Amino acid sequence: MISERVSAYCTKIPLLAEVTEWALLREWALSEVYRITLRSGETRILKWGGKEMAQEAANYRRLVNPLHIVAPRIFDFYESERSAVMIMEDAGKYNLEQQPCPELFLEAARQLARIRDTATMNIEKNMPISHIHQYTETAFDFLTHAKDLLRSPRLADHSALSKLHDIFPQQLERLYHTQPLTLVHHDYHAKNLLIQGTQIMPIDWSISYLSPHLGDLHCLIDEAREYSHVPREEMLSAFHSAMEQDCSMEQLKWQVNIGGLCWLVKTLKWLVYGGTDTIPGSDEWVPDLMDELELLVSKIV
């Protein structure tokens, strides 16, 4: 059984007449993902996205593919005013959330380093200037997100935001002046890391953008510890071993901390300005995210 919002596309997608089986893989307010089986026996992934999640096909065309990032093949996509459907390669049955494994978390860290180096090398070579500007989150953007959090009724009185306000401008200036622009996934979590033997393929680039920050590694380190008890130092070492850029371990630790702050500020901004209305229960995420932000601020001060 498929939802009305997916069935609305059936007349627009001839391939769906060939589907013999639908298997729902994931569903939430702004996204539905199915594995579909065709009469030929082949499988594909069908993904419906609403609102900001509808831009994933555009992100593949303008970001992921031009930057030569390994990703599932997009066979076709169909866009309407407020939603879109993609037909994608079925690139793997299990992800790291379903089958957590210490060595694969370490490989995910190494893969992230390779992705960032590849993206940096190809941004100016393969992306039009207009797309670079369109997809770049600047230091000013992150400062604006932080100021918006200070103005939000729910978080305005939180002391961590006042401390962040004091240190963030200088830290962002250092980040953007010392680190190259690269691709940020912004949802580099176990659920989006497909297992391909001993390799990892990230999927779901719907909210990706360009920035130097390393929030993706911050998130991955937390999940590696939660799911597979992989120590933080081992994850940092794995990432460091795959980097092409010359960087000390101390510099890398700082990058992860400031990257974590960038990730938290952008995520919290989305949540408190409408995200909690979109995702039932997400209001409960905010206190933990603020505790995390407070901890990172204390590490940098």
Identify the function of each model-found stretch:
Residues 23-37, 45, 169-215:
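Active-site acidic catalytic loop and adjacent metal/ATP-binding pocket
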Residues 80, 85-101, 145-150, 261-280:
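A glycine-centered beta->alpha junction motif in the catalytic cores
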Residues 213-247, 260-281, 292-296:
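Active-site activation/catalytic loop segments of kinase-like enzymes and analogous catalytic loops
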Residues 2-14, 120-185:
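An alpha-helical support segment within catalytic cores of ATP-dependent transferases
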Residues 10-19, 67-70, 176, 246:
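Short secondary-structure junctions
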Residues 130, 246-260:
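All-alpha amphipathic helical-bundle segments outside canonical DNA-binding/catalytic cores
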Residues 1-18, 280-301:
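Regulatory N- and C-terminal appendages and interdomain linkers associated
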Residues 25, 30-129:
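ATP-binding pocket architecture of kinase catalytic cores
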